[in-house]
Amino acid sequence: MRQFIPMRRVLAVATLGALFWAAPASWAAAPPEAASCIACHGAGGMGNPAAGYPRLAGLPEQYLADQLRYFADGARNNAVMSGMAKPLSAAQVTALATYYSKLKPSGKPAPMPTGAAAAEGERLALRGDWEKGIPACIRCHGPGAVGVGENFPALVGQSAAYIEAQIKAWKDGSRSGDPLGLMHTVALRMTDAQTQAVAQWLAAQPLSPTKSASAKH
């Protein structure tokens, strides 16, 4: 007698197979816990821009470990990530952070915005708005916004949706853990229009800094 296999199971197996073949060569070295990360953050750790899931690949190891701890203890308020992070042991947190920090980021930036919003985004990222006490993004996140040290991660390679959501989270207090409360203070001074403009401009920048994206006018 021929056994009937539910279509749901067939689709599940096909999906897992596709994820396996899409995984980078380094996936063989991934800790077991990373299997739970791939659905949202992708096989290469570059996230899902359409859904607002962030890039993890190439971010500092200590930064990644800190974020998992913040999700676990509530410093970052996200129901899904809190549920993922709370059961992790210290060794598992370290293993995940180490693995994703060693992945090489890849991919193309989002399309460059146009018009007044693009000009405003560039101004905020490269020069800031000192009349409102808003420093340029590159002051802390480095030339090209590629990140500096363990506390100031790369902004390039992240989607506009994610960057905008995080600025709003700093603003409303649902995210904390920033050095000296710096991001909370900056976010409070930004309008929604400024938040959207700088997020869209940063998302359109290349992973490697260019002269225009690194200039401190």
From Swiss-Prot:
Signal sequence region: 1-28
Source organism phylogeny: Bacteria, Pseudomonadati, Pseudomonadota, Betaproteobacteria, Burkholderiales
Post-translational modification remark: Binds 2 heme c groups covalently per subunit.
InterPro entries: Cyt_c-like_dom, Cyt_c-like_dom_sf, Cytochrome_c4-like, Cytochrome_c_Oxidase_Subunit
Cellular component aspect of the GO annotation: periplasmic space
Protein name, UniProt field: Thiosulfate dehydrogenase electron acceptor
UniProt feature coiled coil, ranges: none
Binding site for heme c 2: 137, 140-141
Function of the molecule: Acts as an electron acceptor for the thiosulfate dehydrogenase TsdA.
One Pfam family of this chain: Cytochrom_C
Organism in which the protein naturally occurs: Thiomonas intermedia (strain K12)
Gene Ontology terms, MF aspect: electron transfer activity; heme binding; iron ion binding
Keyword hit for Chaperone: no
Domain Cytochrome c span(s) in chain numbering: 29-104, 116-206
Residues engaged in binding heme c 1: 37, 40-41
Keywords: Heme, Iron, Metal-binding, Repeat, Signal
PANTHER family: BLL4483 PROTEIN (PTHR33751:SF11), CBB3-TYPE CYTOCHROME C OXIDASE SUBUNIT FIXP (PTHR33751)
Gene that encodes the chain: tsdB
